[in-house]
Amino acid sequence: MEVQAEQEFEGIVEEYGDFVYNLTYRVLGNHADAEEAAQDAFLSAYRNFQRFRGESKVSTWLYRIAVNAALMKLRKDKNKRTLTHSGYDDLQLVSPAEGPERLALNSELREHLQQGLDMLTDNLKTAVVLRDVQGLNNEEAAEVLKISVSSLKARLHRGRVLLRQHLQEYLNQHRQET
């Protein structure tokens, strides 16, 4: 790779490093796997940087590569995966002022949310993570996944229904216990 292209790529890594890590973390659910997938994504992007033609935004191109890296890691490790971290530390479900009981419930709810995501197929999970966790709009998420917007909407609907059912079962059980 020529010097100018290397400098340009270094700028991309600097600008999008956290972004790629956060995406892989949301898909994989733990720091070590997310770091490995993010490194794999940037290695793949580096190898293919000269073929990037600028037909899409750099962020979209990196999303696709990062999603692929995370999904490859997920498939490779599927049999030995365990839930080591919820991946939703920044999700504030209750106020810390609510007390230790509410904080424990918050942590438990996060765990069940991650379990619900983990039970989804890769296609459904990725659609939900891109749209509902990463905050992409429908067009951006569809472009990253290389599917139509209507296909994305169908995946989102199925994924959300399954997540809702999973969380509803937990909430019903929790209500019976209290």
Q: Where do the model's predicted regions map?
A:
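A short, charge-rich alpha-helical start-of-domain segment used by transcription regulators
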Residues: E2-N22, Y46
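Sigma70-family region 2
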Residues: E2-V3, F42-K57, K76-D77
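Internal acidic/polar
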Residues: K80-L103, N137
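Arg/Lys-rich amphipathic alpha helix in sigma70-family domain 2
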Residues: R64-H85, N106, E169
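Short amphipathic alpha-helical boundary/capping segments
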Residues: F9-G11, H112-L120
